[in-house]
Structure formats: structure tokens, C-alpha cells
Amino acid sequence: MIIMKSIILLLAWFLTKTQANMLTESLYLSEYEGSVVLNIIDKNLNGISTLSIFNDSTKLQEVRYVASVCSLRSGSFNITCNVITYGTYHVRMFLSGLNMSAFDLYRLRYVYVGLRDAINYNPKYAEAVMAPFALIGNNNIVTIKLIKDGDNITVGCGFGNVDLSTVNTHASKIGRNINPRFMVGVYTNDSNKLIEDDIYSRYTDSESAGVMRKCNLNEVKTTPQEDCIQPFCTKGTVYGNNLVYGSRLRCFSRTRCSQRSRTVPQSVPWYIPSGFTGKQFMYLDNRLGYLLGLDLTTAIFKYTPIVVGHIVSEYLTGIMNYKRLSVRKGPNIDMRGIIGGEIKMILIRNYRKMLDMSGFTPLPVNGCYVTVIKFIGDKRVFNRVWTPSNNTDDGEEHVFVFHQKRSSNIRDYTLRIFPDSGMDTEGSKYTMNTITDVGCSRETHHKSVYPATIKKAIERFCVDQPNISCEYVKDIDRVDINPCGCKQRANRCGERYSNNTLKATIEFEVPKIYDTPYTCEFLGYKSVNSLTFDSPPPPPTTTQAPPPPPTTTQAPPPPPTTTQAPPPPIVINTTAAPLAPITNATLPPSDVITPEAVNLTDDTPVVNEPVNSTFINDTDVLDDSPTTSAPQAPGIVGIIVNKITTTPAPSIGRAPIPPPDVPVEPPRSIPTTNAPSPEEDTVVLSKSDIMRRFLIRLKTRDGETVDIYTWPELNLAPFKTLSYAGIGVVSFALLFTILVVCLIKFSI
């Protein structure tokens, strides 16, 4: 009897221990698919870190913990990432497809570290971001230190962990055109400390390479060595991430910039050893002060890791790094998707099978912004709608609508549109820049300036792919291109596309510049379990009820036409898995987007009430016209931003809604609280929700409606898959213990 009881107790302890170990293993992710190993250590710091990891298997798991230190190990190569948090800041790092050896960092596809003020998203705080290429430094250690007011800054760089006070010493040993490219924050010229509510910038010269210099408002600083150094002077906004890559800045000064200084140099010194091509690409909007990126060495990195800083008052979407680079031909990198305003995404070429979990849906913060990227094999449909933020007082409230479409045989493209001489009036000039294969022996950077009313541009690019060679850019206003650009591919370019035949088309439009800020409203979101992106619009259903018979006062319904049916109304399907409310696990209370009224039915008008004063302009008059009934797609759950009309926009590459094949369940409401309690963090999405695509519907002021399909993203639906495993294991342990005890009792 004693032995039997001992066995029972031992079994119960073992099951409980197994459950605890399972959760621990889930936290450490040692069993995680791929070669990602994440160690989360509680440093008991004053703050919460959100560390999210997903890989090519599209599995996504979120671990929230108090501070963290992560170690990524594979083979003999170790990467240590020290993440330090302060206060209520959140840190996120996305790592995907990690498979490292001694010098093979090329599978580090995602690196994303964002700092948020979880209380009110105060722009006075700076954000520190650290690139994986800093791993080349001492002992392959990267220190990511998030800074707040008064903190000293020490971040890793090519020399290892370098303090600001030692930057000049390091720079002087290598050359004058060296910036501490990984130093982030807002500094004075004589202090390491962050200064709040002031505007500073950094410029490069031979004596003070990379030192942050105070920038008076609306002042343009120049040096004898560099003619076009434009500080980030924008009245009313503090830019904490004034990173500078390369020795020359892309200048947007209206008075003191020369055309000859508008492009980055062919090569500049760099402190990453052996093989760096010396080609840095950096674009700055003088109103945004936004760094976009750079390329790296081919000898050390076969995939190009990139980290981008962002304006701290805005939301950093993330980084996607896909393209495997050719050591022989040099890096092949493009910085993508920029239209003057908020800059949210950087894409790197890749022609392998893309990640299924590749959609990023940043939430609107100060304005309306949605970015969605869909990968279907080698084909990408890329739709964007956004406006600049409204946190400046220089009249920069604009609406930008950007639609892109590529034929199935064209696998990549790049489009950049920058404000060239200001965007104060309609018809302002914009500059489109394309950068192609940076490993080519000749400059492939070119510009085309065109009015805001131009609708189409064709972009030229060279790709390091056997079946894709060379394209070019052309617009109806002006053409300034290098016909092929890549010398070593000139023959193939000529053979495949004689006379530069058009093979890729990018359609864009900047419809108008408005006097009032563009406002946006989050009404709800729909999930689509399966989509056919390239299929034609769904045929008219034959199960609809017949129209009522005509009366003497009502004309008979018109005969059916071949025009496309209007988009369906937003109805929440209760058959879908429970959706997690947006909690402070990933968003500050001010950014929680669970709407006040999202229980939309066929006869419910779209309620255009401000959801959040952070990004809704209460003074803007919104159209309160109701939506129109339409057949409901199956399993739809979704995001609708701003007003909805029944007139589909001429959106390029928009995926049609699949025809309904299941009855529509009664709608349900989404929690409407804007300040969720910490307990709500435990609400999770099921694994099926991870693969469920989302529909986003946007409407511009010009009446265009844009439907975008994407995948859920952590910003939209924080969840923990650990909860299900833990509950299941605990329940099984308890039930098994009770069963054994009962059996023993009855046997006795």
C-alpha cells in the first residue's frame, strides 16, 4: 500500500514537473522548429520586454517577460543579445529562419527592435536599435540599450561596444568619412546624455565624425567637406533616431542643397572588415529625419541584415530581409516602399519561397497607415495607403495612395518617392529614386522627377537571378536612366529584353494634398481562412432571395450586370476562434484599437466616431453614410480603417473575396475597452488564427476603397500559444491523478 501511494505521488509529481518543464521548454524554445534557441532570463529589471520569434514554418510564439537576455546558438557560433528595458518600454525582436555557422549569419532574416512608451507614446524618448552586423565586433556581442532621459548611451558597433566619448578615437584611426553608425539617440556635442524636447542632428567632418550637433530650427548645416548636410530640423517634432550612414546625406533643403550632392558616394571607408562594398544608401526626409538603411559586406554576410531606425513618435513596422547575396557579384539590396510621409517598411530581394507569415499590419497612430505585404510563391502583391503623421505644424497633412502591380514573371521591384521641394501645394514635385544592384561596377542610382498627378512609373532593376535580368524605370514626365546599369549583366540584359522592353509596371498616385489632416478610424477586422488571390471576382450567387415583385410605386429591379459586386459588409463570424483584445502586452493604452462600435451588420451604419485621440482628428468631418448590404464571405473577421463606401477603388492587385460557402453566423462585438487590465494578456489566439488571413479595408478622401488581405501580426493580435499547452498538461495531470487515486481506493 505504501509503495502504491508512493508511486501515485511520484507519478503526480512527475506529471506536474513535466508540465512545468514543458512551459519552461516553451519559454526557452529549445524544441522550436528550426535552429532557434532562445534563453529568457529574468533579470528582475524594472520593465517588461516582449520577445517574439517566428520562422519559416510560420509558427509564431510570443513570450512576455520582465527584461530578457537572449542567446542564439547554432554550431560553434554564438550570438548574445543583451536587451535592457526601462520603465514601461517594450522591446521586440523578431528572428526567423536562424541557421548559423561560424560566419554564416545570412539566415538571420528578421531583426526588429522597437521601443515604445507604453503609457502615452511620448516622442521625447529616443529609441535605440542595433543591427546584427554589429556582431562583427568584440566577442560577437551586441548590446541593445533602450535609453530614456538622462541615460548614458553605450551601443555596439563595428568595434564592439563603444561609448560615444570614444567614437572620435575610433574614427580617426580609420578615416574621416566614418560615422558611429550604430549610435542612436539625441545627444549634445559635449555630453552623452539624451536631451528631451530639443532637436539635434549629426554631421560628418574630419574632426568630429558622427558627433551629434545641435540644430537650430530650420537651420541648414554644411561643412567644407560635404556640401549638402541637411539636419533634421522640423519645428514641433523631436527625432530621436538621427542615424547617418555614409558620408553624404540626401538633402532636401530648399535653399542650400546642390544637385551634385544628392547621391551617396560610390565608396566610403567602413569599419566592418573585409569585403564591404562601401555602398551605403541613406535617405532622409528633412521633415521626418528618417533613416532607411544601408547595405553590408558580401564576404561576411550572405544575407544582408538591416536595421532601421524610426521617428520615436511613430510606430516601427519591421524589417524583412530575404535576398541571398552573391559573394562573386556583390550585394544586391534595395530599400523599398517610400512615399514622402511615414516610412514603415524595408524590403530586401528574395526569390525563394517567401514566408507565409509575411504580412505586417501596423496600427494607425498619428494618422492613417496600413502596410500589407503578401507573398504567394514568387509573386508579391503590395498595396499601401498612408498619410504622414500629423505631429508637425508645417502644413504636411497629405494623403498618399500607393498601388503596385507586377506581372507574375517579374519578381521584384523598388519604388521610392520623396518630397523634392516641399509638399505645401497641390502639384508639388516629387522625386522617385531607384537603387539597383549595388555590386555592379557602375552607378545605378538615378532619379526621375515628376508632378504629383503622374499615375505610372516603370522601374528598372537588375537582379541576381538566372531567369530575371534587367528592368528599367520610366515615367511620362522625364526619363533619366542607365539602360542596363549592371555591366557584368549587360549581355544577358540585352538578350532577354532587347531595347529595354517594358516588363514591370508600378502604378502610383498622389491624388491630392488636403488642408485638413487625414483622419482614420478603426472599425473592426475580418479574418479570411482561405483566399485565392489571382482568381477572378466571385460570380453572382444563385442562392439569393428573389427580388420583391414590382409595385405601382416602385420600378422593377434592374437586370444583373457584369460589373463587380460591391464589397461585403463587415460581419464578425462567431465560428472563428476567439480573438484576443489588443492589450498592453504590445500596445500602450492610447494605441489600443479595439473600437467603440464594431458590431456591424447589414443594416448597421458605419459609425465614424473617434476611436483614439492619438490618431483621430476630432475636427475632421467624416461621412456617416451607411454601408450597403452584400453577400457575406465565409469566416470573415477584419480591419476597416476610416469610412467605407460601396465603390471599390481601382486597387491594383487586390484579392477578391471568395464566394460564400457557409452560412453567416450572427455577429459578435469586439471588446471596446481602451485600457485592458493585465489579466487580459492571457487571452490567446489559436494556432489556426495564426494562419488566418486578414482583410483590411481603407477608404481615402477621394472615395477610393482599398481592400487588402494579409496575415495577422503581433501588433494586431497578441497571443501566447503557451497557454493552451499549459492548460492541457495541467488538466491531464489532475485528471490522471484523480483517476489513479480512485482506482486504488476502489481496489482497496
From Swiss-Prot:
Protein name, please? Putative transmembrane protein ORF88
Annotated membrane topology is: Single-pass type I membrane protein
Segments passing through the bilayer: 724-744
Which stretches of sequence are listed as region Disordered? 531-574, 650-680
The UniProt record lists the keyword Transmembrane helix: yes
Give residue ranges on the Extracellular side: 21-723
Q: Which keywords fit this entry according to its UniProt record?
A: Glycoprotein, Host membrane, Membrane, Signal, Transmembrane, Transmembrane helix
Task: Give the highest taxon in the source lineage.
Answer: Viruses
| Glycosylated residue positions | 55, 78, 99, 152, 189, 390, 467, 499, 573, 584, 599, 612, 617
Please tell me the species this chain comes from. Ostreid herpesvirus 1 (isolate France)
Q: Which residues lie on this side of the membrane: Cytoplasmic?
A: 745-748
What are the disulfide bonds? none
Q: Where in the cell is it found?
A: Host membrane
Biased composition, class Pro residues, residue ranges = 535-570, 656-669
GO cellular-component terms in the record? host cell membrane; membrane
The signal peptide annotation in the UniProt record is 1-20
